Amino acid sequence: MIIVTGGAGFIGSNIVKALNDKGITDILVVDNLKDGTKFVNLVDLNIADYMDKEDFLIQIMAGEEFGDVEAIFHEGACSSTTEWDGKYMMDNNYQYSKELLHYCLEREIPFLYASSAATYGGRTSDFIESREYEKPLNVYGYSKFLFDEYVRQILPEANSQIVGFRYFNVYGPREGHKGSMASVAFHLNTQLNNGESPKLFEGSENFKRDFVYVGDVADVNLWFLENGVSGIFNLGTGRAESFQAVADATLAYHKKGQIEYIPFPDKLKGRYQAFTQADLTNLRAAGYDKPFKTVAEGVTEYMAWLNRDA
């Protein structure tokens, strides 16, 4: 069995899909379906069982067994960069991850987990997986950073695989439940389909991010499980492309629309990553050599998926 926490969420459900594509269906999905809309991410997938995250954590802390577990993909977390309840964030992202890590170490179960590019904070260069480059801007980024630091202490002595992925700006299918945290491509598509003007912040040609397609993210996760490599790795494309490029690709797909530029909100000033670009040196050195989709390629594929029933 393979366990996927956050398996009804964005990246988790795409990992389940990638496993299904390889013929793997003996999957336990762990999530919190209080937001009942997330079920749509699983409705076309095949899994063996579902468990609520609170029940799962209780069983993990009690040392209960789940049969022959081949790996745990730990994607479950509070991923809102605008959530400022530090106790909630640390319980949900840090303590929970530690419990799961030790459970895996004791049983030598491969543990593959979601870190984040938010660990780098407001950098504009040198997004490198090393302490001197890390300075998160929000408590979400701090919770991810602190767990990475915890993992770094354990990695040299670990007898089983531990790998963390610093996700950059992931976009693609199965993110609709994320609301305001969904990607720009998702929101632009929704606005166009609602007959509204697609909106970007003023200066969006200058805001550049490393936008990585979720299908590529799932592929990297599965490659690492198959190859048993440990460590903490950036997971982006290695390219910074502008929000304007995302909009251009979206409008090109729809063949309509005129961007409306809106003022940059004061509340985001100083807390907004204006530039991200993954340094892929370590990922490539680990042996992962496949190309990543460009924004034009990924957004076009995503638009086709979003509008498949249109």
Swiss-Prot record:
SUPFAM superfamilies: NAD(P)-binding Rossmann-fold domains. Completely inhibited by ADP and ADP-glucose, and partially inhibited by ATP and NADH. Optimum temperature is 42 degrees Celsius. GO terms for biological process: ADP-L-glycero-beta-D-manno-heptose biosynthetic process; lipopolysaccharide core region biosynthetic process. Its EC number is 5.1.3.20. The modification N6-acetyllysine is found at K267. The keyword Ribosomal protein does not apply. Binds 1 NADP(+) per subunit. NAD(+) can substitute for NADP(+), but enzymatic activity is reduced. It catalyses: ADP-D-glycero-beta-D-manno-heptose = ADP-L-glycero-beta-D-manno-heptose. Changing K208M: Activity similar to that of the wild-type. Its cofactor is NADP(+); NAD(+). Optimum pH is 5.5-9.5. Keywords: Acetylation, Carbohydrate metabolism, Isomerase, Lipopolysaccharide biosynthesis, NAD, NADP, Stress response. Substrate binds at N169, S180, H187, F201, E202, G203, S204, R209, Y272. Pathway: Nucleotide-sugar biosynthesis; ADP-L-glycero-beta-D-manno-heptose biosynthesis; ADP-L-glycero-beta-D-manno-heptose from D-glycero-beta-D-manno-heptose 7-phosphate: step 4/4; Bacterial outer membrane biogenesis; LPS core biosynthesis. One of its GO terms (cellular component) is cytosol. The active site is at Y140 (proton acceptor), K178 (proton acceptor). Essential for E.coli viability at elevated temperatures. Insertional inactivation of the gene by the Tn5 transposon results in E.coli being unable to form colonies at temperatures above 43 degrees Celsius. PANTHER family: ADP-L-GLYCERO-D-MANNO-HEPTOSE-6-EPIMERASE, NUCLEOSIDE-DIPHOSPHATE-SUGAR EPIMERASE. Catalyzes the interconversion between ADP-D-glycero-beta-D-manno-heptose and ADP-L-glycero-beta-D-manno-heptose via an epimerization at carbon 6 of the heptose. Homopentamer. This is ADP-L-glycero-D-manno-heptose-6-epimerase. It comes from Escherichia coli (strain K12).
